[in-house]
Regions:
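Generic preference for well-ordered alpha-helical elements
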Residues: 66, 116, 143, 168, ...
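Flexible helix-coil junctions and inter-repeat linker/turn elements that act as hinges
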Residues: 71-86, 99-107, 122-141, 155-159, ...
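Alpha-helical solenoid scaffolds in large eukaryotic transport, assembly, and signaling factors
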Residues: 20-190
Length: 348
């Protein structure tokens, strides 16, 4: 059996020396080596990235530091749990710096700012290595962040392709965390407008071909879980989603819709999901009817959605009879597995 690949040697360690072998290799597999040096480099990077009117050579050095940070942290891609004891020290400094930047200049900050792009790039790298769900826990989650982050995201959206793709992705994840904070979004016209603005800008990223679509699905899934938003906004989303499934020529948009529903069905309150289950199943039906076999990513998420819907219908105690809809979703899963087998056979 082939041996598992070991992390690349750390700077300052001669691969040919005695210290680079044996127990040192085992240590690299069981701890975050050179953490102090890494955190020192991160501090230098943040300071350089946020320098006002930095000359070209400082900006070049900032990029070099970012590339080195990314190279060093990518070593732990396959054993990312080793980073867990240090995640707060890793994620909080760039996240807090981003928070300060956005809070003080959300209406004036250039969406193409090199500082904004650099900070979001580093946060994306951490989410890639350790997973967005875990890294998101260390993003600021204060009510005061909602409006500044939303304003900046709207300006980023208006700027289009000139903005680094990591920027909208991180802002969408950040807003998704803020949406989980227990504060009221009902009662005032202003609050209702904020909720509508969040939904509108997040929906606009669902047809994206990149990570922004993933961030948008997470944000919408969490927004629709809020009691004051779910009652009217989620049914309207389902109606819109069925129309887009039938009419949209974009497989990316279909994927984004299914991703959003997967988030909602997995994490929403059981009674709420069951209340809208038939409508969600209608979207799934349209996904099968209009997209089956045309896109692997669409197939993946419709299969995931069918599985989650079936789980939501399973009773907590042994029933006298099983809901017929469970059989329908299980049949959909079996068909998807059969379809996957055909794909594997023909591509072998």
């Amino acid at each position: 059996m082939a041996a598992a690949a070991l992390p690349a040697p750390q700077p300052g360690l001669d691969p040919g020396s005695d210290e680079a072998g044996g127990d040192a290799e085992l240590l690299e597999l069981t701890s975050f080596a050179h953490v102090d040096e890494y955190l020192a480099l991160q501090r230098e990077f943040i300071q350089a990235a946020t320098s006002v009117d930095a000359p070209d050579h400082i900006q070049a050095e900032t990029q070099q530091k970012l590339q080195q940070l990314e190279k060093d942290i990518n070593v732990y891609q396959e054993q990312s749990y080793l980073l867990d004891p240090y995640l707060e020290a890793l994620v909080s400094p760039p996240a807090r710096t981003l928070q300060q930047l956005v809070r003080t200049a959300s209406t004036e900050l250039d969406p193409t700012s090199s500082a904004l792009a650099a900070l979001c790039r580093l946060l994306y790298v951490y989410s890639k290595v350790r997973g967005y769900k875990i890294v998101s826990r260390f993003l600021p989650h204060e009510v005061g962040d909602l409006l500044p982050a939303l304003v900046l995201l709207e300006r980023v959206r208006q700027s289009g392709s000139r903005v680094s793709w990591e920027v909208p992705y991180v802002l969408l994840l950040w807003l998704g965390i803020v949406c989980l904070v227990p504060f009221s979004l009902k009662g005032g016209t202003h609050d209702e407008q904020v909720a509508s603005r969040i939904e509108l800008v997040a929906r606009s990223y669902l047809p994206s071909s990149g990570k922004a679509r993933d961030g948008a699905a997470v944000l919408l899934g969490r927004l629709y879980r809020r009691e004051e938003v779910a009652g009217s906004a989620f049914p309207a989303f389902l109606t819109w989603a069925r129309g887009r499934m039938r009419e949209s020529g974009s497989q990316f948009e279909r994927t984004g819709i299914l991703q959003t529903l997967c988030e909602m069905v997995k994490n929403g309150e059981t009674h709420f999901v069951q209340q809208h289950l038939d409508s969600v199943a209608g979207v799934l039906h349209d996904a099968v009817q209009f997209a089956q076999g045309r896109n692997t990513l669409v197939d993946r998420f419709r299969t995931k959605l069918a599985g989650r819907l079936a789980l939501r219908l399973l009773p907590t105690q042994a029933p006298a009879a099983v809901d017929d809809r469970v059989d329908a979703f299980v049949e959909e899963l079996l068909q998807a597995l059969q379809h996957q087998v055909r794909i594997d056979i023909t591509s072998a």
